[in-house]
């Protein structure tokens, strides 16, 4: 079987599996977030944290709960890393010292669902920090994104109310009823596929082919690997992430990890459709996500398999930075999945991709990670773009835009526009400051267009809460740890505040009956229009700097 055929088969099987499970999982999540019953474990948690599960919150109260939970999580994880040398299961001789700047960057990274790593995981973080700190945040940060998405959906579904649900109930249910059961199943499948799960520190000594002895770190990898992909987190137990054979040993586990990445983001549109009372609306949102994803992944695969150049031509594809057990095509699919969502996990080295292949991974994030996007964040980002599309369509026909019976007034469009502009502002401002500082330019391992691409990728990844990297710059410095940490905080929390404000505004409205002039938002025309509006907006925003970076490199 040729690499191209194998890649197409890999992609087709993923699409088929996602299509098969997204309806039952979406329906299950609908029941989770609309149920009036609490389990015994949930009631115990509510008593411990002092939450009233029957008390509803306004958008402001919901937002304050998100901010408070995130702040406490950052402080806890920051402190846990700094004192890990006094805790059980710590590394006796870590390769990278845990400075306050690095601890801040890492704490913010995992709390914001980014999982940007300026360190090598297996030689820096002890097992207790990995389990009680990083893995826990992999669960709760994903649940926060899902909770915010559900709050926005309630804004569309409810009428004449200021209440969006209860953040603490949404957080607990998302973890106990959705993420934890799926992660357990995923971890067991990964262990069956060869991923490791132990408490070895640096005790595994093996003999290499040359006869030398090599010490290989172990750890509780499979448990963290499952939620890393399922929650679209992406932070690896090992420095090389899912390229490491202990994390992702075989083509089967590679397929499974890809499937876990896409599972919840593609199922949430079904949940959305059920909650607003029109399954067709969910199908339309899923179709938009799917169209963007298929186009991006196919183009990335083509650019990696057929790119010009002496070495790629000689070997038949761009094999640099690619694991032979996966191959170019499967790696390109994984790269597309991980950057179209907010995952950021990698099974190949994006910095070694062809210039235009690397451009695709960056452009996926600059789209706002909406095809299908992160767990929760992909759905609310897609709904924001649907609102903008409805507004543009309303301008063309001269009528007040409506979406799902809710009028898109100046307040709603201002919030939607602010959401769309927030992340590009962080990306472009951060990149400009980094390139303007001689000290930061000195940390670049490459110059010219590719050097600019590496800096742009770093801020694109952190501001969009992705976490993958081109890795050609030295980011474990006080400036980069601080600057990228701020990009992650503002890139996560500012959009969440705007989404919740929009949800509150929509929930306060009644429903306008459909008329002859109402734009149908469940038909193929709307799907195509939304894809077009998205591409145009992103191109207008990022084309100038992309022309100086990966496009210039590709043309050269």
Swiss-Prot record:
Asked if the keyword Transport belongs to this entry, the reply reads yes
Q: Does the record's keyword annotation contain Amino-acid biosynthesis? A: no
Origin species: Mycolicibacterium smegmatis (strain ATCC 700084 / mc(2)155)
Q: Kindly indicate where the leader peptide sits in this chain.
A: none
| PANTHER family in the cross-refs | POTASSIUM-TRANSPORTING ATPASE A CHAIN (PTHR30607), POTASSIUM-TRANSPORTING ATPASE POTASSIUM-BINDING SUBUNIT (PTHR30607:SF2)
| Gene expressing this chain | kdpA
InterPro entries from the UniProt entry: KdpA
Which GO molecular function annotations are given, in alphabetical order? P-type potassium transmembrane transporter activity; potassium ion binding
Subunit info here reads: The system is composed of three essential subunits: KdpA, KdpB and KdpC.
- Functional note: Part of the high-affinity ATP-driven potassium transport (or Kdp) system, which catalyzes the hydrolysis of ATP coupled with the electrogenic transport of potassium into the cytoplasm. This subunit binds the extracellular potassium ions and delivers the ions to the membrane domain of KdpB through an intramembrane tunnel.
Q: Where are the transmembrane segments?
A: 6-26, 65-85, 133-153, 176-196, 249-269, 283-303, 378-398, 415-435, 483-503, 526-546
Name the membrane topology term.
Answer: Multi-pass membrane protein
Q: What is this protein called?
A: Potassium-transporting ATPase potassium-binding subunit
């Amino acid at each position: 079987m040729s690499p191209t055929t194998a890649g197409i088969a890999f992609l087709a099987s993923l699409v088929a599996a996602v299509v098969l499970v997204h309806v039952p999982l979406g329906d299950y999540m609908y029941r989770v977030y609309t149920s009036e019953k609490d389990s015994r474990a949930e009631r115990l948690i509510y008593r411990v944290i002092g939450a009233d599960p029957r008390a509803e919150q306004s958008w402001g109260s919901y937002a304050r709960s998100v901010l408070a939970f995130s702040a406490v999580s950052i402080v806890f994880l920051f402190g846990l890393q700094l004192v890990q040398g006094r805790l059980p299961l710590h590394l006796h001789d870590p390769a990278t010292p845990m400075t306050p700047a690095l601890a801040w960057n890492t704490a913010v990274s995992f709390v914001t669902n980014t999982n940007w790593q300026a360190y090598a995981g297996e030689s820096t973080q002890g097992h207790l920090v990995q389990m009680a700190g990083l893995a826990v945040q992999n669960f709760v940060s994903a649940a926060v994104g899902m909770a915010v998405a559900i709050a926005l959906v309630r804004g569309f579904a409810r009428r004449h109310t200021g209440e969006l649900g209860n953040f603490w109930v949404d957080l607990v249910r998302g973890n106990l009823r959705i993420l934890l059961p799926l992660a357990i199943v995923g971890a067991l499948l990964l262990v069956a596929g060869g991923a490791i799960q132990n408490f070895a520190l640096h005790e595994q000594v093996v003999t290499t082919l040359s006869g030398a002895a090599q010490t290989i770190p172990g750890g509780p990898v499979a448990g963290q690997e499952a939620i890393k992909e399922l929650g679209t987190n992406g932070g690896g137990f090992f420095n090389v992430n899912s390229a490491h054979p202990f994390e992702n040993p075989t083509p089967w586990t590679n397929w499974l990890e890809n499937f876990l990445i896409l599972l919840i983001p593609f199922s949430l549109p079904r949940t959305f459709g059920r909650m607003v009372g029109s399954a067709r609306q969910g199908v339309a949102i899923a179709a938009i996500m799917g169209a963007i994803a298929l186009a991006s992944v196919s183009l990335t695969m083509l650019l990696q398999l057929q790119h010009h150049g002496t070495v790629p031509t000689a070997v038949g594809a761009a094999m640099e930075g690619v694991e032979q057990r996966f191959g170019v095509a499967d790696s390109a699919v994984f790269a597309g999945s991980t950057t179209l969502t907010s995952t950021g996990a990698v099974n190949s080295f994006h910095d070694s991709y062809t210039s235009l292949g690397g451009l695709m991974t960056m452009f996926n994030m600059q789209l706002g990670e909406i095809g299908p996007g992160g767990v929760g964040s992909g759905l609310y980002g897609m709904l924001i773009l649907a609102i903008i599309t409805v507004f543009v369509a309303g301008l063309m026909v001269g009528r007040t835009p409506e979406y799902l019976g809710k009028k898109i007034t100046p307040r709603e469009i201002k919030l939607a526009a602010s959401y769309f502009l927030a992340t590009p502002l962080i990306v472009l401002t951060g990149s400009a400051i980094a390139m303007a500082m001689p000290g930061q330019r000195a940390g670049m391992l490459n110059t010219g267009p590719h050097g600019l691409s590496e800096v742009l990728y770093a801020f694109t990844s952190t501001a969009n809460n992705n976490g993958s990297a081109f890795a050609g710059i030295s980011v474990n410095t006080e400036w980069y740890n601080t600057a990228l940490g701020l990009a992650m905080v503002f890139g996560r929390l500012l959009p969440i505040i705007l989404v919740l404000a929009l949800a509150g505004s929509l929930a306060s409205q009644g429903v306008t009956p459909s008329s002859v002039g109402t734009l149908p938002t469940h038909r193929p025309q709307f799907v195509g229009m939304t894809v077009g509006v998205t591409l145009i907006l992103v191109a207008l925003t990022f084309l100038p700097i992309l022309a100086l970076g990966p496009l210039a490199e590709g043309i050269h």
